[in-house]
Design a protein with these regions (language model features):
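Cell-envelope and extracellular/periplasmic
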Residues: 23-341
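Bacterial Sec-dependent N-terminal signal peptides
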Residues: 1-26
Length: 341
């Protein structure tokens, strides 16, 4: 491929400009992706606003429910963090809030924010199943067309964590906060939506749903390496076989496979650890089928995962609600029926 002199000069100018822009560091001013317009923030607990900026930069955070201006400086790694007090939600009051984050001349504004209860919803396909039909075995909610048509609940918001696999804990994750409406409701987790709707109707406070789930995933995939390594039985059962396998030497990509979704730690690293600075009212867990052969150790595994999450979120009393996987065709004389739950 041949370039004219003018094209080469233009290319060199663009590269030089891009390099100087990167060295200046202004482009790295950012806030965590979980902090967005349309979000619900947890009532009665500090809101942690965090992100990155050029090392040593002053970052200013203002919110419209507190008169104080909050300031901090990014550390040597470019990380910064500020805690903002959050009041309790008032039932029936849905005043929308704003947050402004600035560094130098750069200002980021978050709007249409509500204060309420935020729930972390995780597990496998039982939790991931949307209100609308998706796959032959994920048929959606009963009367899903009527449910979607009536899903006009702007005080219910959803952040669906983008499914991903990581060998090491990630700083951030993908996803977008959306407001519940007939347009967006089809993509809501059915279980999370009906749970949120019932709580909202009873309590009249906004409900945020952070759904972090992947079909077919195992409990060990949602548990940290340290947690599995520090328990001799869990290490022997899950971590050691994986660490000595061919799969552990592969570079992990984002392609979903049945083999990959049961690997230890990968969803914790990509889809739980990035949420570490959020506060939650509690967690909903609907999983179990992919651990159906691990009945002798599953209780121990779940207990350690819960302990792991509570430590991560700095909340030793964080409520954790299980949905027991229901027996499937239990009345039939089929000793394999439990596999189809």
């Amino acid at each position: 491929m041949k370039f004219h002199k003018s094209q080469l000069l233009t290319l060199l100018f663009v590269l030089q400009f891009s390099f100087s822009f990167a060295v200046d560091g202004t482009q790295i001013f950012s806030i965590a992706n979980t902090l967005q317009s349309n979000m619900v923030i947890q009532q009665g607990k500090p809101l942690n606003v965090w992100g990155t900026a050029k090392s040593g930069s002053q970052v200013i955070v203002r919110v419209d429910w507190v008169s104080k201006i909050f300031q901090t400086k990014s550390d040597k790694d470019g990380k910064w963090s500020v805690d903002i007090p959050v009041p309790n939600a008032i039932p029936g009051e849905f005043n929308k809030k704003k947050i402004w984050i600035s560094q130098g001349k750069q200002i980021k504004e978050l709007s249409n924010i509500l204060i309420g209860d935020v729930w972390l919803c995780s597990g496998q396909s039982n939790m991931a199943m949307e209100i609308k039909p998706w796959l032959p075995w994920l048929l959606g909610a009963n009367s899903y067309r009527i449910e979607i048509e009536n899903a006009n609940y702007p005080e219910i918001r959803l952040f669906k964590v983008r499914a991903d696999f990581k060998a090491m804990p990630e700083e951030d994750c993908g996803g977008t906060w959306v407001v519940c409406s007939p347009k967006t409701a089809p993509n809501f987790s059915a279980l999370a939506y009906f749970f949120a709707r019932q709580i909202f109707i009873k309590r009249k406070i906004p409900i945020g749903l952070v759904v972090s789930s992947v079909g077919g995933s195992s409990c060990q995939a949602w548990t940290s390496r340290e947690t599995l390594a520090n328990d001799s039985q869990l290490y022997k059962k899950y971590l050691f076989p994986y660490d000595t396998s061919r799969q552990s030497k592969e570079q992990i990509d984002s392609v979903v496979t049945f083999e990959k979704v049961v690997r230890p730690t990968i969803f914790y690293n990509a889809m739980i650890y990035p949420l570490r600075n959020l506060h939650f009212t509690g967690s909903l867990w609907y999983q179990g089928e992919s651990n159906r052969y691990d009945s002798s150790i599953y209780t121990q595994l779940c207990a350690k995962m819960i302990y792991n999450w509570r430590n991560l979120f700095r909340d030793p009393q964080l409520p954790f609600y299980f949905v027991q996987v229901a027996p499937y065709n239990w009345f039939q004389n089929d000793d394999k029926a439990y596999e189809y739950a």
